[in-house]
Amino acid sequence: MAYRKRGAKRENLPQQNERLQEKEIEKDVDVTMENKNNNRKQQLSDKVLSQKEEIITDAQDDIKIAGEIKKSSKEESKQLLEILKTKEDHQKEIQYEILQKTIPTFESKESILKKLEDIRPEQAKKQMKLFRIFEPKQLPIYRANGEKELRNRWYWKLKKDTLPDGDYDVREYFLNLYDQILIEMPDYLLLKDMAVENKNSRDAGKVVDSETANICDAIFQDEETEGVVRRFIADMRQQVQADRNIVNYPSILHPIDHAFNEYFLNHQLVEPLNNEIIFNYIPERIRNDVNYILNMDMNLPSTARYIRPNLLQDRLNLHDNFESLWDTITTSNYILARSVVPDLKEKELVSTEAQIQKMSQDLQLEALTIQSETQFLAGINSQAANDCFKTLIAAMLSQRTMSLDFVTTNYMSLISGMWLLTVIPNDMFLRESLVACELAIINTIVYPAFGMQRMHYRNGDPQTPFQIAEQQIQNFQVANWLHFINNNRFRQVVIDGVLNQTLNDNIRNGQVINQLMEALMQLSRQQFPTMPVDYKRSIQRGILLLSNRLGQLVDLTRLVSYNYETLMACVTMNMQHVQTLTTEKLQLTSVTSLCMLIGNTTVIPSPQTLFHYYNINVNFHSNYNERINDAVAIITAANRLNLYQKKMKSIVEDFLKRLQIFDVPRVPDDQMYRLRDRLRLLPVERRRLDIFNLILMNMEQIERASDKIAQGVIIAYRDMQLERDEMYGYVNIARNLDGYQQINLEELMRTGDYGQITNMLLNNQPVALVGALPFVTDSSVISLIAKLDATVFAQIVKLRKVDTLKPILYKINSDSNDFYLVANYDWIPTSTTKVYKQVPQPFDFRASMHMLTSNLTFTVYSDLLSFVSADTVEPINAVAFDNMRIMNEL
C-alpha cells in the first residue's frame, strides 16, 4: 500500500542514501568527482527544501534497504572508520595550529644542527684595519668678501655621515653606533697583521694600516704641507723591541678614534695558552675516565694565546616562565645530543629474525589459543631499538619531556614499560602519559595478579597510580619495586660548576633490575583469580620473555647510564629540569625492541664525538653570554640616552636572533617583555660600559664633524646681516649662541607650546632654538633675494610647526653663476634666520700622530682540543664507574 510521508520524516531514507554517497564522493580527490558532489548536494538541498510531496511505496523501501545490506556492512564500518580517522586527523591539525601560535616552530633538524655547529669563537673579529669614526677632508677657504681662495684647509669629518635631524633621532643614531661598535669590538688586536708599507718612507718603513698610509699620501702631496711634516712622514716607521715581543706602529687618528683603539689594545681578551690550561679545559670526568686514553701535544709555542670562553650560568633563568624559549633550547640540545649518542648498529644487536624465532619458541606459538600473544612480536626491529636508545639518552641530556605511546592489550609493551619506568626517572615523562602508562600496568598486570578490583583513577589526583598501589599491595617485593619507582628522581649535583642531573646509584650499576625481576617473578606466580587461564598464561609468558634476558637488561641499564654520564660531562649549561611544552614520543614497542635485541657489544662515544659535542656546547654557551652582555649594554644605553620611544622589544628580538636557533616572530609577546625585565636587572659588563662612556663624552665632537646637521637656529623678528665665514663664505651661520635666549627644540616640539617664542619675537628679541636641525645648502643668490623680506617670522611660528622649519645656508661667493647680482657692494644681504653650526675640529698632523703598541706576534687557537689526541680501550674492556665491565654478559 502506498502512503504519503509528512513533515520532518519526508525523504528520510533517500536522504540517508544520498549522505552515504556524499561521504564516498568526499573520499575521492578527483576534481570532476567533486563537481558531481556539489551537484548532488544541490539536488539534496532542493529535495529537502522543496514543498512538493513525493509518494513512495513500502516495496521500494524494502528493496532499497535490502540492497544496502547486501552491498556489505563491512564497507559501512570501513567508511565509518575512515570518517573517524579523518576527524581525528582534523583535530590533530587544529591542535597543531593552536600550538604553532604559542610555540616557536623549528626548521628541519639538519638546519638546527648546522646552526649550532656554525656558532664559532669570534674569529671574524680579527681586525685588518683600526676602528675609525673620523677621516680628514680638505675644505676650501673663503676671503672676507666671499671669494674662494685657492688654498685648502684640512678638517676632521665623519667617514660615514648618516646623522639624522632631530635631537631624538641623533641620540638613536648614537645608540646604533654603539651597537655597531659592540659587534665590531675586537677580542684582540695584532697590529703586525694590519700594517702596510709607507710609500713615502725613506727606508721601507710601515704604518699601522692602509687608511693611515692613504692619509699620509694625501698630506704629502698637498702643496700646503710644510716641509717639516713631509720629512716627518718620510721618517715614519715601526719600532720593534724583539726581546719584549713588542712592536710600535705610527698611526694617524682623530683623538676619539685613538681613545677607542687604545682601549681595545689595552683590554684584549687573549690570554697566554699553556699545557695546564688545555689539561684543565678537558672535562674532568673525561680526563679521569679509564676508557679514554688521552695524549697531549707538549710543543706549544710561547706565543700561543686563547680566548677564555664566557661560561657564566643561569643569568636569565630561561627555564623559569619562558616556556617557548626553553622549548626551543631543549629541542636544539636534543637534536645535537641525538647526533652524538652512539648508534646501536645491527651488528651490535642480536639478529632480529633469530630473536623473534627464539621468542616464538618461548611462547610456544604453534599451540596458541589466543590472539594477544602474537602482538608480543609486533614491531620488534633493530631500527626501533636504536631509535629508543638514542631517544632515552638524548632526552635526558637535553631534559626534554617524553610521552609514551602504547597499546593496553600488548602485555609485552607494558612489561617493557615496567623496565623503562624503573630505569628512567619519573620527571622525564609527561605527567598525563606517565599516569596512563602506570594505570595500564596496574589494571592489566598488577591488580589482576592479586585478584584486586580495577583501580578507578580520578583525573587530577596528586598521587600517581603507582603511589596509590604501593599503599594497597601487601606483597613485599612488588611494593618495594613500586616504592623505588615512586622515589626515582634525578639527583642534582654540581660538577665543575655545572648543575648535573645524575641517576640513582642502583640504576648506574644495574642492581635495580634484580629488584624489577623479583617483582615480576612474584607477579607471574600469582593466580590471577578473577581472570581466565589464557589471560594468566599470556602475562606469564610475557614476563618469561623479559626475565630470560635478565643479564642483558642489567647490561643495557649500565650501558644507558654510562653513555648518559659520559656525554653529560660535555654539557656546559646547567641542566635545569622543567617540563617542556612539546614532547618527544616514545613507542613502548621500541622499548620492547631494545630490551629484546640488546646484545653483549659495548657501545661508547668516540673521543672525537665527545670533543665535538663539548666544543659545540662551549661555543653556544659562550655566544649566549656574549649576546646577553650586548643586549644588557644596549638596554642601559637606551635608558641613559633617554630614548623614551625606543621599543625595548626590538632589542630583545635582536638578542634572540643573534642566538641563531630561535624563530623570533613566533615567540609570544609576554615572554619578550619578561625577558626584557630580566635583562634590565643584569649589570653591564665592564668593557661595554667603558665604550659607552667614551661615546657619551664625545657626542658633541661627533655631531660637529657632520655636514648633515646644524646644532640649532636663531630666529628674529627683524632681518639679521649675513656674516663672513672662513669655511663657507658669506653666510647666515652663527658659531656661538652668546647673548641669545635659548629654548630646547625637542622640548618645544613635545609640548607644542609656541607662545613663548611668539612673545619674544614680538618684543624684538632674537631666540635660539637649540637642537639637531637639517643643514640645507642653497647657494643661489636669486633665491636669497626672493626670501629676504618674504615673510614675518612670527607668522611662521604661528602657522607652522618648528620641526618643519628648514634653516637655509646662503652662499655668496665667486663660484656662483649669479655673482654679478652682488656687484653693488652697498647692498647688505640679510636673513631672518641664522644657522647655529659648531666648527669641526681642524686637522693637526702633530696632534693626530699616535704610536700604537701591541705584541709583535702571537697565535690565537680557538680549538684547544686539537692539541689532544685521544683513543679508547677495546670496547669489550670498557668499565663503568664501579670498575666492572659495562657489559658483563659475554
Curated annotation (Swiss-Prot):
Q: Which GO terms describe its cellular component?
A: T=2 icosahedral viral capsid; viral inner capsid; viral nucleocapsid
Molecular functions (GO terms): RNA binding
For region Hydrophobic, the annotated ranges are 404-424, 432-452
Task: Please list which residues make up the signal peptide.
Answer: none
**Interaction with the intermediate capsid protein VP6, annotated site positions:** 232, 236, 849, 851
Is Nucleus among this UniProt entry's keywords? Answer: no
Q: Which Pfam families match?
A: Rota_VP2
Please list where the region (5-fold hub) is annotated. Answer: 1-88
Keywords (A to Z) from UniProt? Capsid protein, Inner capsid protein, Repeat, RNA-binding, T=2 icosahedral capsid protein, Ubl conjugation, Virion
How this chain assembles, per its entry, is: Homodecamer; each decamer is made up of two conformers of VP2, called VP2A and VP2B. Interacts with a VP1-VP3 complex. Interacts with the intermediate capsid protein VP6. Interacts with NSP5. Interacts (via N-terminus) with NSP2.
Functionally, this protein is described as follows:
Inner capsid protein that self-assembles to form an icosahedral capsid with a T=2 symmetry, which consists of 120 copies of VP2, with channels at each of its five-fold vertices. This capsid constitutes the innermost concentric layer of the viral mature particle. It encapsidates the polymerase VP1, the capping enzyme VP3 and the genomic dsRNA, thereby defining the core.
User: Family, per the entry?
Assistant: Belongs to the rotavirus VP2 family.
Q: What name goes with this protein? A: Inner capsid protein VP2
